[in-house]
C-alpha cells in the first residue's frame, strides 16, 4: 500500500471482550481526539457474551465514517483478534487502545503523528501513562521510564524489551507506529505474531519497531491503564499466571534465538522466569505444571536456578509439599494482620 492509497492516515485498533462497562469510555476517549488528519477505528469484539457487541454496533452506526466493526466470528483470542484488525487497517500509522483502558489527552494522536511525519527514521512514538484503579478511581505511576530521551536508538532498547517484567518499556496503548514496517515484519515471520504459544501481541511489535529504527518518547501522560479486575495478564489464579508467564517467555526465547541475542541479563531473566513458574506450580499444588518447568528449562536452554532446585526438593514429596504450603499460609496470614 503506497502513501497515496491510504484512506486514513491513522488507524486505531480497539480490542474488546465482555467490557460493556468500559468500552463506551474507551471509544469516547478516541472519538474526542483533535487531529488535523483523518483517522479510523478498527473495532474487534471477540464474541462478547454481555452487551459489548450491541454497544459496538451502536457506535458503528453512529460513526460510520470512522468506526469499522469487524465481523462477528467464533472466539479468536487476543492474538488473532489483534492481527486480524491490524491487517484490516487502512492507515499509514497504527495506534491502539484496549477496551478497558482510555486516553486522557485529546491531542495524543496529533502529537504522535506530527513526530512520525517529521522524523522518517522514527518507527514508533510512545508516551507516559498511569495505572487507573477501577474501584477507587485512583491513579498511580508505573515508575520511571528507563529510556526517557526524546529519541532513542531502538537497538539500545532491545534487551530491555525482551526482559521486561513490570513496567513495559513501551506501553503499546500509548504508542503509534508505522504500518508498512509492521506489515513487512509480519509477512517475513508470521510465526512471531500468530503463534498461540506466545500469549501476547504487543512485545513482538515493540521489539520489531525498536529493531528497525528509532523510538520517540513524549513525557506526557496520555493513557489510563485500567486494573482492579482479572485479565489475561492480571490474575490471582496461579495456574492462569503460570500459563501466561510461560507463553510470554516463550516469545522472548524465540526472539532471542531468531535475532541472536544472548547475554548475562537475558540468561538471568530466563532463570528468574523458571523460578517464578516453579512457585506458581508450588502454590497451586500441580504436579503437571511442576514437570512443565523442566520442559521450559530445556526449551529456553537455561539451567534451573538453585532456589528453584530447593523448591523442587520440597515438591518431590507430597508430605513436604503440603507442610510448606501450610507454613506459607501461616506467614501470609501474619503479613495480612500486620498490614492492618
Predicted regions, residues:
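Conserved donor NDP-sugar-binding/catalytic core segment of glycosyltransferases
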Residues: 107-142
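Short, well-formed alpha-helical segments that are part of the catalytic scaffolds
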Residues: 19-32
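Conserved nucleotide-sugar donor-binding catalytic segment
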Residues: 146-239
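Catalytic core of nucleotide-sugar-dependent glycosyltransferases
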Residues: 154-155, 197-198, 221-229, 234-264, ...
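Membrane-interface aromatic/basic loop that binds lipid-linked glycans or pyrophosphate carriers
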Residues: 275-340
